[in-house]
A protein has these predicted regions:
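Short, flexible loop/turn elements at secondary-structure junctions
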Residues: 7-10, 105-106, 136, 183-185
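PAPS-dependent sulfotransferases, especially Golgi type II membrane carbohydrate sulfotransferases
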Residues: 1, 88-92, 151, 166-170, ...
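Distinct, well-ordered alpha-helical segments
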Residues: 110-120
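Short N-terminal targeting/anchoring amphipathic segment
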Residues: 97-104
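Structural motif
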Residues: 99, 128-130
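PAPS-dependent sulfotransferase catalytic domain
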Residues: 80-94, 112, 123-126, 133-203
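PAPS-dependent sulfotransferase catalytic core
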Residues: 1-83, 211-220
Length: 245
């Protein structure tokens, strides 16, 4: 099985990827996990740099730098050279691991290109999506703390990543599990039990209990900004998806 974690930066994707990896859903290796744990993610990012590099190449090909934090993002393009790299990394992990996946927020922008590779390699039947979300204002506050990004710019970026990820999920019929970072922090074991039921694999509740730090999020309160109507509408749409279990 291939489990891909989709979600905006600062939305809890590292927490979900860490829980998966510690429960034997291989999200990478020590060598490929980068960056190493930092103050904003003391338990690690569980971000597979091999996939992140390819995502950056896909975006750079159309002139976009993810670290610009601009919310106008072109559709990625795949060159033959990048396609070969994508095929190679997918085959490497799928040959070595029975249940694997990866997490990189940029995949919200590149997931369609990866699915093309899975289709060509006859691996599409293995794919499951875990979509992780968090309130736009909380993400924006976190980005302001980490990157000194204005709240309005952070919310605009949240909207682009979230819309692109959701649009992919809606336009395809891949098994998809929706979960929120707020929900994970409130009742981690309950939410993770549902996630592993979706994945049809066992998990260790004690790992979840010790891994999830309910105090890790400090951006639930803080500076406020007016929430644009389109973002409110998108959050309402997500709430309805979260309610379906």
């Amino acid at each position: 099985m291939i489990s891909i974690v989709l979600g905006m930066h600062r939305s809890g994707t590292s927490t979900v990827a860490g829980i998966l990896h510690l429960n034997k859903v291989i999200m990478g290796t020590y060598q490929s996990f980068w960056p190493r744990p930092l103050p904003q993610n003391p338990k690690g990012f569980y971000e597979n740099y091999d996939f992140r590099i390819i995502n950056d190449r896909l975006l750079n090909k159309v002139g976009y730098d993810a670290k610009s934090y601009e919310s106008e993002i072109p559709e990625p393009l795949v060159s033959d050279k990048i396609k070969n790299a994508m095929v190679k990394i997918v085959q490497k992990y799928d040959t070595k691991y029975e249940h694997w996946g990866w997490k990189d927020p940029r995949t919200c922008l590149t997931i369609s290109q990866w699915v093309t590779i899975f289709t060509e390699l006859n691996l599409i039947h293995k794919l499951k999506i875990i979509f992780v979300t968090r309130r736009a204002i909380a993400v924006a506050r976190s980005l302001k703390t980490r990157n000194d990004l204005p709240l309005e710019k952070g919310m605009a970026l949240w909207k682009t990543y979230t819309e692109r990820g959701l649009s992919f999920c809606e336009q395809n019929d891949f098994p998809t599990f929706y979960m929120s970072f707020e929900g994970i922090l409130q009742s981690p074991e309950d939410h993770c039990e549902k996630m592993f039921d979706f994945l049809e694999t066992n998990f260790d509740p004690t790992i979840v209990k010790h891994f999830v730090d309910k105090k890790i999020s400090t951006s639930g309160t803080g500076e406020d900004a007016e929430i644009p109507n389109d973002i409110s509408d998108l959050e309402f749409k997500i709430e309805k998806l979260l309610a379906v279990k």
